């Protein structure tokens, strides 16, 4: 009987280790039971020397038995214990899964807030979308952090009306709070973050917004959450926002905005100004070799005091300048070394864009087999489910399709991006999109290419 109960209580979980088995079952002899099961039965399989799972047919039977025997309250308690185990390990994705299955909305809210602080930037919202969407509206309206998250999430889903609605709710929340109220200060901080970060806002007002937020910071009226300036892309000028309009006055903006920008962005601002002006000059066709030589020594400071986003932006610019000066092998090595380093550090959200960048280098050097391998194994290829965070990969995918002589596939890949490019003033992405579309039309002998 104790073994049977032990099995039923672990059935909801795909895999587990000894510590989790002990915590979920509450059985101090969990180690002995696992040892007995491994020795005398074939119910358990090893994931590795620490983790186990039931074979799928047996787990399905156990779950059926558990549904039959355990009350809903008891099942929810098991999920809550599993959620607590993952929470203590700071594995918030699995913890959220458990708490959602157990219907514990307050824990889901709490973890979403905590996870947003641990993993800043727009990528977090896309990963956590289903948990945000599962929360009751009243729960979201009670939390400035969750309203901020919903506003950004709607923007990333290209629901700009929904995004502005949640921005308005957050604004109303801030107005209801007093100037000294901690919740009011948090709401004003989140509004300032959205004013800078929302993709549909463009960059036109940022030259006024950033100094205004800088003054609020200096007066300790707001404390800003972390940003993701690049959205895990190898660029600042075409990262979270398109800053190409600033390129005309880059020297003036560098002198006037450098200090406010670095103060407002905190860790995200380390190395940003120097990388941004070097990239601006590069995009205008100027020689940036000298600027790169002064920028590279800052990489250590970026690693120690900054963010991996900026590290990728600097390395991405270096690789592009190496490619432009006829050193494709060096460009490939720059990205490969960084990819290995990021993989070791568990920074997996950058890897898909790094792989896409390596694919572009392969096409530049004529290694079409490698480009086709990326297309088969890693390209998004999901025209009906647009994720704007993958736009760099969509454009790379279209390049491979052109290379393979498939102009219809190019149009299918690029068409969903057009509304995003227009609504969010993405000038550089728009140039890439229009050039690739024009080439595809030309190859089809369609006069619209003009």
Predicted regions and their residues:
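Extended alpha-helical scaffolding segments used for macromolecular assembly and cargo binding
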Residues: 72-153, 162-166, 441
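Structural signature of alpha-solenoid helical repeat junctions
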Residues: 74, 94, 100, 107, ...
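C-terminal boundary/linker of central alpha/beta nucleotide-binding cores
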Residues: 1-68, 77
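Amphipathic alpha-helical segments of tetratricopeptide repeats
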Residues: 39, 96, 116-117, 132-137, ...
């Amino acid at each position: 009987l104790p073994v049977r109960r032990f099995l039923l209580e672990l059935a909801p979980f795909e895999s587990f280790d000894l510590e989790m088995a002990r915590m979920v079952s509450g059985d101090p002899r969990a180690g002995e039971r696992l040892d007995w099961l491994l020795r005398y039965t074939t119910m358990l399989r090893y994931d590795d020397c620490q983790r186990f799972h039931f074979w799928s047919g047996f787990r399905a039977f156990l779950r059926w038995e558990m549904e039959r025997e355990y009350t809903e309250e008891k099942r929810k308690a098991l999920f809550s214990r599993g959620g607590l185990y993952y929470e203590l390990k700071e594995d918030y994705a699995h913890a959220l899964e458990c708490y959602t299955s157990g219907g514990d909305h307050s824990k889901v809210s709490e973890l979403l807030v905590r996870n947003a602080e641990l993993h800043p930037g727009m990528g977090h919202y896309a990963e956590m979308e289903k948990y945000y969407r599962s929360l009751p509206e009243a729960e979201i309206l009670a939390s400035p952090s969750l309203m901020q998250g919903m506003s950004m999430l709607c923007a990333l889903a290209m629901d700009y009306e929904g995004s502005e609605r949640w921005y308005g709710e957050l604004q109303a929340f801030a107005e209801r709070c007093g100037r000294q109220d901690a919740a009011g200060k948090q709401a004003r901080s989140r509004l300032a973050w959205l004013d800078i970060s929302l993709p549909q806002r463009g960059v036109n007002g940022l030259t006024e917004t950033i100094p205004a937020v800088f003054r609020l910071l200096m007066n300790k009226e707001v404390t800003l959450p972390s940003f993701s300036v690049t959205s895990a892309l190898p660029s600042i000028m075409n990262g979270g926002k398109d800053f190409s309009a600033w390129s005309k006055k880059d020297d003036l903006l560098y002198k006037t905005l450098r200090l406010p920008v670095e103060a407002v962005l905190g860790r995200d601002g380390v190395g940003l100004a120097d990388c941004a002006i070097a990239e601006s000059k590069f995009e205008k066709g100027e020689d940036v070799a000298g600027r790169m030589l002064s920028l590279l020594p800052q990489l250590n400071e970026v690693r120690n005091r900054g963010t991996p986003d900026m590290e990728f932006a600097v390395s991405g610019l270096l690789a592009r300048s190496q490619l432009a000066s006829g050193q494709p092998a060096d460009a490939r090595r720059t990205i490969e070394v960084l990819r290995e380093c990021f993989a070791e550090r568990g920074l997996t959200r950058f890897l898909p864009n790094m792989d896409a960048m390596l694919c572009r280098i392969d096409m530049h050097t004529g290694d079409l087999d490698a480009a086709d391998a990326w297309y088969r194994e890693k390209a998004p290829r999901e025209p009906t489910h647009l994720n704007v965070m993958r736009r760099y990969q969509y454009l790379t995918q279209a390049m491979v399709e052109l290379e393979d002589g498939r102009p219809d596939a190019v149009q299918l890949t690029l068409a969903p991006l057009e509304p995003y490019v227009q609504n969010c003033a993405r000038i550089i992405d728009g140039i890439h999109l229009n050039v690739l579309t024009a080439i595809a039309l030309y190859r089809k002998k369609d006069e619209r290419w003009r």
